[in-house]
Curated annotation (Swiss-Prot):
Name assigned to this protein: Putative GTP diphosphokinase RSH1, chloroplastic
Record's keyword terms, sorted: ATP-binding, Chloroplast, GTP-binding, Kinase, Nucleotide-binding, Plastid, Stress response, Transferase, Transit peptide
Domain ACT stretches: 796-867
Phylogenetic classification of the source organism: Eukaryota, Viridiplantae, Streptophyta, Embryophyta, Tracheophyta
Source species of the chain: Arabidopsis thaliana
InterPro entries according to UniProt: ACT-like_dom_sf (IPR045865), Beta-grasp_dom_sf (IPR012675), HD/PDEase_dom (IPR003607), HD_domain (IPR006674), NT_sf (IPR043519), RelA_SpoT (IPR007685), TGS (IPR004095), TGS-like (IPR012676)
UniProt domain TGS: residue ranges: 562-625
Residue interval of the organelle targeting sequence: 1-55
């Protein structure tokens, strides 16, 4: 068992240069090749990072009156002993000069002048042989036959880029080799590495074609290079018309990248490696380009790396971008990190020692593990900044930067037998940690039992090691060696050059060919879970083609997929992730469009909630659908939900559903409602009303003759007959929107009390009539009881709804708000079916009744209603209004 309590962080020269010390003596510690692709990395491997700020400060050094000007925005080298192992430690050069000069003991720094002026003569140092010598160590894991393919690709790239220079003045070939080296550090397959070497050859030269690449290296390499070329080529196009803007062209660029990703996942991985090296050398770009590229990286590429579980690349992209996007905030965060480390260094070292001792003394771990590594880790600069923003406090109030990461390497199953699994070992270690220190409530997170959608697995807990001496908080992470590998490399593990597996994700994401067919850390099912979000991109493209501009498409992805997420469960235990702030409406449309269209309510953790309920992490969500919902009711509900939909994809689906309902079912909604909706959605009113005219004979069918019935007289002989030709149409909010007609006649006519049935035109027979076949007889029996007590006509309202707490109160509140007088009320619950029936004896005129029924129909969980007037001598012929 090992423990790492300290480390040395050094930032190396990243340009082709002769370094100059403060005394003016020349140094040549770096060659033209070794420093270029390390630019600017604080660590080797995939924890590489930079220590330079994006703001230039000028310092002077020299002798004999000769000064050499040095800019802080060039890459510097310093060494500083810190207590965090294997983590990027970012320190601003200006802070180094101010505070580190006085530091003694184990703290030391060296600062060198960096110049690109001498790079012009470096091209002669670059040959295929020297390039191979520097690339080989990172890809030495590949078999000899595959190394030959990589070497062949290197020669082809060298020939294609011969004579080309980067903005820094270095040979262009340095860039593709650096990309290949990053891919090699991730131990990717040879096809990805060759694609990294050739990713710019077709675009930037006339020497290489896709056909030649396929002939030399196969269809997979061509497919990856072709995807890369499509992505990078569009960004260089100029606007073709005056209506196009630079943002539109860039959006189309990103759209093509997202679509290329859905065909081949390795297109993303190579693109991330390409962007990472470009970010490392971003200092050579003009300031406005630096800000633009860094912002795009922070908004698109870093979240993409996170979705793929590639946290090593994600962290470096975030930190590099953070320095350019917000230099002052970056300085404040790094300064806070340095101060906190100095303040809690002794506590961290002591906590590390105590934990290592506890693990070493545990006999169970000695039996089932090869070794257990305890690492001291510093949180990433940008993650600390985001946490401070989330808490809405000052960065100086943030005090939790340290982590202890425990990585367990279990013995092979043959040696351990059925004694335990790797997961059980992790839980055992968690128990050891809690034996030493009590956890802070609600800080224990089990990502082993419920992994994140990108596959991340680990146990997290936060403790206060020295409660009675200090409030120093320490996060402890526990994982196996395999979990740690997947956490750092993510989906890249699937394409590991040492062991590969391949297959298809449904019918949507082909994975490329497999050279050996071995199984690595991820199988096909694991892979499918981690890249399922790619299928959503393809579905959006197919579903909204022609309805969504490139900019809208990119906004949909960056907001709906790449933003902050919440994770919820389906009733079957599947994990679904949505943007933070998403509602049940977004969840329903994420599951399926038809589910969203037919939704009437939802259950969260077993409780009935509104579809506008904002989802929180770990909630179990179940959608309640209703197939027989009238078009009128569906239109009104979804129109209300539109403003509560968080995701752009859900809003597009709701808008399309509303257009369809407005065009097909105009008889159940007013023309004013349709026109208001069309105006809001920027649709063409004339096109919509033309469809309505063809299907429903325009709006004259909405206005029909009805008889305003009252319950003031028992006998219909005392009810005045209507005059011929009179027309009365009920209104809601001043608009005609109810059609009442005699169901026994095709022609509308006046209804006298006790004659026939008057009903509001339903889209179809309410389904609750089939579920509750005895509803009518139950209702009639209750009304008969009221007749027996009062001996006069009865006006009544019957409401069928889902069985949920508080729904009777909500319905009665609606009735009271409309001025409806309630005389009696009775309710029954069918718990087996989850339905409730409410019967109210009311006093109201027809206009108020129609108005209140429209509002009752919008109450959450209401499935339908009926209303009527009954007389003692003719109960069976009562008038009924039904929806």
């Amino acid at each position: 068992m090992t423990s790492a309590s300290s480390m040395s962080v050094s930032v190396e020269c990243v340009n082709i240069c002769n370094l100059t010390k403060g005394d003016g003596n020349a140094r040549s510690d770096c060659s033209a090749l070794s420093c270029a692709w390390k630019a600017p990395r604080a660590l080797t491997g995939f924890l590489a990072s930079t220590a330079h700020p994006p703001v230039c400060s000028v310092y002077s050094c020299g002798r004999n009156g000769r000064k050499s000007r040095m800019k802080a925005c060039a890459w510097q080298r310093y060494e500083y002993e810190v207590g965090f192992s294997e983590a990027p430690y970012f320190v601003n050069v200006r802070n180094i000069l101010k505070s580190r000069l006085s530091c003694g003991g184990h703290k030391r720094w060296e600062l060198y002048c960096v110049s690109a002026e001498s790079s012009s003569g470096a091209s002669s140092d670059v040959t295929v042989e020297t390039l191979w010598e520097d690339l080989f160590p990172s890809i030495s894991y590949l078999p000899r036959k595959e190394l030959e393919f990589v070497q062949k690709g290197l020669k082809l790239a060298f020939e294609a880029h011969h004579g080309q220079k980067r903005r820094s003045g270095e040979p262009f070939i340095i860039h593709p080799v650096a990309v290949a080296r990053i891919l090699g550090e991730l131990e990717l397959d040879w096809e990805s590495i060759v694609a990294g070497l050739l990713h710019d050859t077709v675009e930037d030269t006339n020497f290489i074609t896709f056909e030649k690449i396929e002939e030399e290296f196969g269809a997979t390499v061509r497919h990856i290079v072709e995807g890369e070329t499509k992505v990078s080529k569009l960004g260089k196009l100029k606007c073709k018309t005056e209506s196009e803007t630079i943002q539109d062209v860039k959006a189309d660029d990103l759209r093509q990248m997202f679509l290329a990703m859905t065909d081949e996942v390795r297109v993303i991985i190579v693109k991330l490696a390409d962007r990472l090296h470009n970010m490392r050398t971003l200092c050579h770009m003009p300031p406005h380009k630096q800000s633009s590229i860094a912002g795009e990286t922070l908004q698109v590429f870093a979240p993409l790396a996170k979705l793929l579980g590639m946290y090593s690349i994600k962290s470096e992209l975030e930190n590099l971008s953070f320095m350019y996007v917000s230099a002052e905030d970056y300085d404040r965060v790094t300064s806070r990190i340095a101060n906190l480390y100095k303040e809690h260094e002794k506590e961290l070292t002591e906590a590390n020692r105590i934990l290592v001792k506890k693990i070493e003394d545990d006999q169970f771990l000695d039996l089932v593990t090869v070794n257990t590594d305890v690492r001291s880790v510093c949180k990433e600069t940008y993650s600390i900044y985001k946490a401070a923003l989330k808490s809405k406090g000052s960065i100086n109030d943030y005090n939790q930067i340290a982590q202890l990461r425990i990585v367990v390497k279990p013995k092979p199953s043959v040696g351990v037998g059925p004694l335990c699994s790797p997961q059980q070992i992790c839980y055992h270690v968690l128990g050891l940690v809690h034996e030493i220190w009590k956890p802070i409530p609600r800080t224990v997170k089990d990502y082993i039992a419920t992994p994140k959608p990108n596959g991340y697995q680990s146990l997290h807990t936060t403790v206060i090691p020295f409660l009675y001496e200090s409030m120093f908080r320490l996060e402890v992470q526990i994982r196996t060696e395999e979990m740690d590998l997947i956490a750092e490399r993510g989906i890249a593990v699937y394409y590991n050059g040492k062991s590969l597996s391949t297959g298809l994700v449904g019918n949507a994401v082909p994975l490329g060919r497999n050279s050996r067919g071995k199984t690595g850390c991820l199988n096909n099912a694991d892979f499918a879970l981690r890249v399922g979000w790619l299928n959503a991109i393809r579905e959006w493209q197919e579903e909204f083609v022609g309805n969504m501009s490139s900019r809208e498409f990119v906004d949909t992805i960056t907001r709906d997929l790449l933003g902050s997420r919440v994770f919820v469960f389906t009733p079957k235990g599947e994990i679904k992730n949505l943007p933070k702030g998403a509602t049940v409406v977004d969840y329903a449309y994420l599951i399926h469009t038809e589910i969203g269209n037919k939704m009437v309510a939802a259950k969260v953790n077993g409780n009935l909630v509104s579809p506008t309920h904002v989802l929180e992490n770990a909630e179990v969500v179940e959608i309640v659908t209703y197939n027989a919902l009238s078009s009128k009711s569906a239109f009104q509900r979804h129109k209300q939900w539109l403003q509560h939909a968080k995701t752009r994809s859900a809003r597009h689906k709701i808008m399309r559903f509303l257009r369809e309902q407005a065009a097909q079912c105009a008889a159940e909604i007013t023309q004013d409602q349709v026109n208001d909706f069309v105006a809001d959605s920027d649709s063409d009113v004339e096109d919509l009303t033309e469809d309505s005219r063809k299907s429903l004979q325009w709006w004259e069918k909405i206005l029909v003759n009805v008889k305003q019935f009252q319950s003031q007289d028992k006998s219909r002989d005392t009810t005045p007959a209507p005059q011929n030709g009179s027309v009365w149409a009920p209104k809601v909010n001043g608009k005609h929107n109810k059609a009442i007609k005699n169901s026994s006649s095709d022609e509308p006519e006046f209804l006298l009390p006790g004659d026939g049935i008057a009903r509001i035109l339903p889209a179809n027979i309410p389904a609750y009539k089939e579920v509750l076949p005895g509803l009518d007889s139950w209702r009639d029996s209750k009304i008969a009881t009221w007749h027996h007590l009062e001996g006069q006509s009865i006006e009544w309202l019957c409401v069928v709804s889902m069985d949920r707490k508080g729904i009777i109160a909500e319905v009665t509140t609606v009735l009271a708000a409309e001025g409806i007088a309630l005389c009696s009320c009775v309710a029954e619950i069918d718990r087996g079916r989850g339905l409730a029936v409410m019967l109210f004896q009311i006093e109201a005129n027809i206009e108020s009744l129609v108005s209140v029924c429209a509002k009752v129909d919008l109450v959450l969980g209401v499935l339908g209603w009926s209303s009527g007037c009954s007389w003692p001598r003719s109960t069976e012929n009562a008038q009924v209004l039904e929806c």
